[in-house]
Amino acid sequence: CALPIFSASSSILTKKGIFSIETIVEKMCHAPAQIYGICNRGYIREGYQADLVLVSHGERWEVNTENIPSKCGWSPLEGNSFRWKVEKTFANGHLIYSDGQVDDTYRGEELRFDY
């Protein structure tokens, strides 16, 4: 993603009623892994890398510079509010984001492609 909006993109799509959660998972997880031939990614399956994002639906929250979990520290979505929120993120099974805190000590693994 070229802009720092990935964490809010699913919120936007569900808020506007554009896609169901199942369709968002298909478009943001399954399809990229299939299209680009990324090995062992994009699905929750035995033997696959555990790249997961846990989201919750609840209280409204507003995007601002204090709660943007991005090194760039800005977002074109500042000032917008959402009910969906990323609570935890796992990369290769390692917890790298939890309740607003980023673990920047973990380095992911190189992607492998099946061409």
Each predicted region: which residue ranges?
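Active-site microenvironment of metallo-dependent hydrolases
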Residues: 2-115
